[in-house]
A protein has these predicted regions:
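Alpha-helical adaptor scaffolds
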Residues: 226-236, 246-309
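The tetratricopeptide repeat
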Residues: 220, 224, 261, 298-299, ...
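Small-residue-rich helix-interface/hinge motifs
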Residues: 45-108
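Terminal, low-structured helical/coil segments at or just beyond the last alpha-helical repeat
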Residues: 321-355
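Polar-ligand-bearing catalytic/cofactor-coordination segments
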Residues: 67, 104-110, 165-233, 237-240, ...
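Alpha-helical repeat scaffolds
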Residues: 203-215, 238-250, 274-289, 312-326, ...
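Hydrophobic transmembrane alpha-helical segments that form the core helix bundle
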Residues: 107-198
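Topogenic membrane-insertion module of multi-pass membrane proteins
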Residues: 1-46
Length: 355
């Protein structure tokens, strides 16, 4: 899909989102509220509608997953996760990646089942259903401004999620439609995500990698290549890891995969004491939101960067503190946790010895 088309769709989606707020203000204005209170209540109503719609979007995935044999692992919005473990539900908190506002994770025993596309389509189907319900509500009540809020809002969210780029539902559906063989990588990714939430201490990252065919393309295939590179890194095979991530950067156009590969190359540069290379990667504008995430593996790398490159001891200690605090909330598998605990200990030793 051309860049102009993508930008056009995003522009239309943003305009629709703005229009939904305008409809909210007008709707409350017609109820007799002053301009100030119409603005306050209208914007609050649309904001809450967005949050509710995101929850319903994920419930759509969960419902379609249930219909096709998926077992619910977690359902979340923002930093909050509802996790199902041993038949019981409990709440958890996690860090949030850029552009990921909500998530559903489910696992399936029969991994040869191609109906994963139906599960991935659940959120989009919810938006279509909500638009139809809003239209029906408008005809029945003649309160079209309130109906328009949900029509326009869901149309905006449908467009952004259906667009086949990045890590959207549309991109994943298109990938599996075009390359059905990638379903194996998709199921492996789901099992990895589920394991990090349910029992991270029982498995290593290397348990969730598999060979990727030379011509494989798409997020799921590239994610598997990333995990293989991270296994090389954890095992100290820096040459192999560097080659893997450089190769990924050369072939991918997925912004998330690019960011992870670049952060991994920053990690390797720090291990190799290549200060200029590390500073070059850290200065990439698109990486800054990722490098600020309060996750153990990122903050450990941030601590080493502040120590080796910036020589800022205050920020080094702050990053170390965050890395330790977030150790359990970062959902690291057994070998990952051991690696970052050791890397943190090495940094603390260097600080104590004044090296």
């Amino acid at each position: 899909m051309g860049k102009k088309v993508i930008n056009l769709v995003y522009t239309i989606a943003i305009i629709f989102l703005i229009l939904s707020f305008a409809c909210g203000i007008i709707a409350f204005g017609e109820l007799g509220y002053s301009l100030f209170w119409a603005f306050v209540f209208g914007c609050a109503f649309v904001y809450l509608s967005i949050k509710l719609t995101l929850i319903l979007h994920e419930l759509g995935h969960a419902f379609c997953g249930y219909l096709t044999g998926y077992r619910l692992v977690s359902l979340g919005i923002g930093r909050f996760l509802l996790v199902k473990k041993s038949g019981k539900f409990y709440f958890s908190r996690t860090a949030v990646f850029k552009n990921v506002s909500a998530q559903y994770i489910g696992i399936k025993e029969d991994e040869s089942d191609q109906r994963i596309i139906l599960m991935l389509s659940g959120g989009l189907l919810v938006h279509l259903c909500l638009m139809l319900l809003a239209i029906l509500f408008g005809f029945l009540t003649q309160t079209w401004y309130f109906a328009a809020i949900w029509i326009i809002l869901n149309l905006s969210l449908f467009l952004t999620n259906a667009l086949p780029i990045g890590i959207t539902d549309g991109a994943k559906i298109w990938e599996l439609w075009q390359s059905p063989e990638n379903v194996n990588y998709a199921y492996m990714s789901l099992r990895h995500s589920a394991q990090t939430i349910l029992a991270p201490e029982e498995c290593d990252l290397k348990d969730f990698v598999m060979p990727v065919s030379e011509n494989a393309q798409g997020f799921f295939a590239e994610n598997m290549l990333v995990q293989q590179g991270q296994v090389f890194l954890l095992e100290g095979k820096l040459k192999e890891a560097k080659q893997q991530f450089q190769s990924i950067l050369e072939q991918t156009d997925n912004s998330l995969i690019q960011a992870i590969a670049q952060m991994s190359l920053l990690h390797i540069a720090l291990l190799e004491d290549k200060v200029e290379t590390a500073e070059e990667y850290a200065s990439i504008l698109k990486l800054k939101p990722f490098l600020s995430l309060k996750m153990t593996h990122i903050q450990t790398m941030q601590a080493w960067y502040q120590y080796k490159v910036k020589k800022d001891l205050a920020k080094t200690h702050k990053a170390i503190q965050i890395a330790k605090e977030k150790m359990n909330a970062s959902y690291l598998l057994r070998d990952e946790k051991r690696y970052y605990e050791n890397w943190l200990a090495k940094l603390e030793k260097a600080l104590s010895e004044g090296i």
